[in-house]
Amino acid sequence: MNIVMFFFDNYMFSDFNKSSLEIACIENDIGTVKKIINLNPNLDISHCLNLAIESKNYQIVKFLLKKNISNSVLLEAYDCACINGKISIMELLIQYLNNKSIVS
Protein backbone atom coordinates (compact mmCIF):
# COMPACT_ATOMS: atom_id res chain seq x y z
CA MET A 1 0.00 0.00 0.00
CA ASN A 2 1.23 3.48 -0.83
CA ILE A 3 2.11 5.28 2.42
CA VAL A 4 0.85 8.60 1.08
CA MET A 5 -2.54 7.10 0.28
CA PHE A 6 -2.66 5.40 3.68
CA PHE A 7 -1.98 8.74 5.39
CA PHE A 8 -4.51 10.55 3.20
CA ASP A 9 -7.21 7.94 3.76
CA ASN A 10 -6.74 7.65 7.49
CA TYR A 11 -5.85 11.12 8.65
CA MET A 12 -6.19 14.06 6.31
CA PHE A 13 -9.39 12.91 4.62
CA SER A 14 -11.25 12.38 7.89
CA ASP A 15 -10.07 15.78 9.16
CA PHE A 16 -11.19 17.37 5.89
CA ASN A 17 -14.58 15.64 6.14
CA LYS A 18 -15.05 16.77 9.73
CA SER A 19 -14.26 20.41 8.86
CA SER A 20 -16.53 20.25 5.82
CA LEU A 21 -19.28 18.70 7.94
CA GLU A 22 -18.99 21.48 10.50
CA ILE A 23 -19.27 24.15 7.80
CA ALA A 24 -22.24 22.36 6.20
CA CYS A 25 -24.01 22.21 9.58
CA ILE A 26 -23.53 25.95 10.09
CA GLU A 27 -24.54 26.82 6.51
CA ASN A 28 -27.64 24.57 6.55
CA ASP A 29 -26.36 22.46 3.65
CA ILE A 30 -28.18 19.20 4.35
CA GLY A 31 -27.10 17.62 1.06
CA THR A 32 -23.44 17.97 1.97
CA VAL A 33 -24.10 16.76 5.53
CA LYS A 34 -25.75 13.59 4.19
CA LYS A 35 -22.97 12.94 1.66
CA ILE A 36 -20.17 13.34 4.20
CA ILE A 37 -21.84 11.15 6.81
CA ASN A 38 -22.65 8.48 4.23
CA LEU A 39 -18.99 8.49 3.12
CA ASN A 40 -17.68 8.34 6.68
CA PRO A 41 -20.39 7.15 9.10
CA ASN A 42 -17.92 6.93 12.00
CA LEU A 43 -17.32 10.68 12.23
CA ASP A 44 -17.94 12.21 15.64
CA ILE A 45 -21.01 14.34 15.02
CA SER A 46 -21.57 15.68 18.54
CA HIS A 47 -19.94 19.05 17.86
CA CYS A 48 -21.71 19.28 14.51
CA LEU A 49 -25.05 18.66 16.21
CA ASN A 50 -24.41 21.62 18.50
CA LEU A 51 -23.34 23.80 15.56
CA ALA A 52 -26.56 22.93 13.74
CA ILE A 53 -28.56 23.78 16.88
CA GLU A 54 -26.79 27.12 17.35
CA SER A 55 -27.45 27.95 13.69
CA LYS A 56 -31.10 26.86 14.06
CA ASN A 57 -30.80 24.33 11.24
CA TYR A 58 -33.79 22.18 12.18
CA GLN A 59 -33.59 19.69 9.30
CA ILE A 60 -29.92 18.97 9.95
CA VAL A 61 -30.60 18.45 13.67
CA LYS A 62 -33.45 16.10 12.75
CA PHE A 63 -31.18 14.17 10.36
CA LEU A 64 -28.33 13.90 12.88
CA LEU A 65 -30.71 12.61 15.55
CA LYS A 66 -31.31 9.56 13.35
CA LYS A 67 -27.66 8.60 13.81
CA ASN A 68 -26.52 6.58 16.79
CA ILE A 69 -25.97 9.36 19.34
CA SER A 70 -25.11 8.69 22.96
CA ASN A 71 -27.39 9.88 25.75
CA SER A 72 -24.74 12.31 27.02
CA VAL A 73 -24.50 13.93 23.57
CA LEU A 74 -28.30 14.21 23.44
CA LEU A 75 -28.43 15.89 26.83
CA GLU A 76 -25.62 18.25 25.82
CA ALA A 77 -27.55 19.08 22.65
CA TYR A 78 -30.64 19.84 24.72
CA ASP A 79 -28.59 22.17 26.95
CA CYS A 80 -27.25 23.90 23.82
CA ALA A 81 -30.78 24.40 22.48
CA CYS A 82 -31.95 25.82 25.83
CA ILE A 83 -28.99 28.18 26.18
CA ASN A 84 -29.47 29.47 22.64
CA GLY A 85 -33.27 29.77 22.92
CA LYS A 86 -34.00 27.44 20.00
CA ILE A 87 -37.54 26.47 21.01
CA SER A 88 -38.45 24.42 17.92
CA ILE A 89 -35.26 22.40 18.32
CA MET A 90 -35.89 22.02 22.06
CA GLU A 91 -39.31 20.57 21.21
CA LEU A 92 -37.75 18.20 18.67
CA LEU A 93 -35.16 17.04 21.21
CA ILE A 94 -37.82 16.54 23.91
CA GLN A 95 -39.88 14.47 21.49
CA TYR A 96 -36.79 12.43 20.57
CA LEU A 97 -35.72 12.00 24.21
CA ASN A 98 -39.23 10.87 25.19
CA ASN A 99 -38.97 8.06 22.66
CA LYS A 100 -35.51 7.00 23.86
CA SER A 101 -34.61 5.38 27.14
CA ILE A 102 -32.24 7.74 28.97
CA VAL A 103 -29.82 6.01 31.28
CA SER A 104 -26.69 7.85 32.35
Swiss-Prot record:
SUPFAM superfamilies: Ankyrin repeat. This is Putative ankyrin repeat protein L677. The keyword Cell membrane does not apply. Keywords: ANK repeat, Repeat. InterPro entries: Ankyrin_rpt, Ankyrin_rpt-contain_sf. It comes from the Viruses. ANK repeats lie at residues 16-43, 44-73, 75-102. It comes from Acanthamoeba polyphaga mimivirus (APMV). The keyword Transmembrane helix does not apply.
